[in-house]
Amino acid sequence: MFNKIFCPIDGSETSSHCLTEAIKIAKAHRSRLMILHIVDDFYPFLDGLEIANLAEIEKELRKNGEKLLKKAAERASSEGIKTESKLVEVLSKKIPTVLLEEADKWGADLIIIGTHGRRGINHLMLGSNTENLIRISSIPVLTIRHKQ
């Protein structure tokens, strides 16, 4: 039923659990899996830091994102899943918009995402990025709540 499953991850426990579920579903449907990590515009949180430090921080965020993707892709591949991974840098667009654009571009027929990520104040039931993705997506979205 699902040929291409798109799973964004952010390094949180919720996204790790989400990846586990995406792997299970991909195995059951013999689907391909795209794992995506976003390095986003974090400048509002860095008020007062020197510009020289920003380049180092960006470099470290990319490096950490690449490590996260490599580990996630190895995890999925070890389960026999055909896996692709992608690191995307977001500077001006909203994360849900970028997620949907990337899922569309790849031809995903299911998006699997955690209910809450690493940043921001949690809304009542869903994280803001997940909630907004659900609102704008033409692709079915399966939300995974963190196992507690």
At which residue positions do the language-model features occur?
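Small/aliphatic-rich secondary-structure junction motif
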Residues: N3-A52, R75-S77, E84
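Short, well-ordered secondary-structure micro-motifs
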Residues: C18, F45-D47, P96-V98, H123-M125
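Aromatic/hydrophobic pocket-lining residues that form π-stacking "cages" and hydrophobic walls in ligand
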Residues: A22, A72, L99, L133
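Gly/Ser-rich helix-loop-strand patches that form or flank binding pockets
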Residues: K24, D104-Q148
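Short glycine/serine/threonine/alanine-rich loop segments
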Residues: S31-R32, I81, A108, I139
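Residue-level recognition of beta-strand->loop/alpha-helix junctions
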Residues: H37, L87-E89, R145
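A short acidic, glycine-rich active-site loop
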Residues: N53-K67
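Structural beta-alpha unit
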Residues: E74-I111
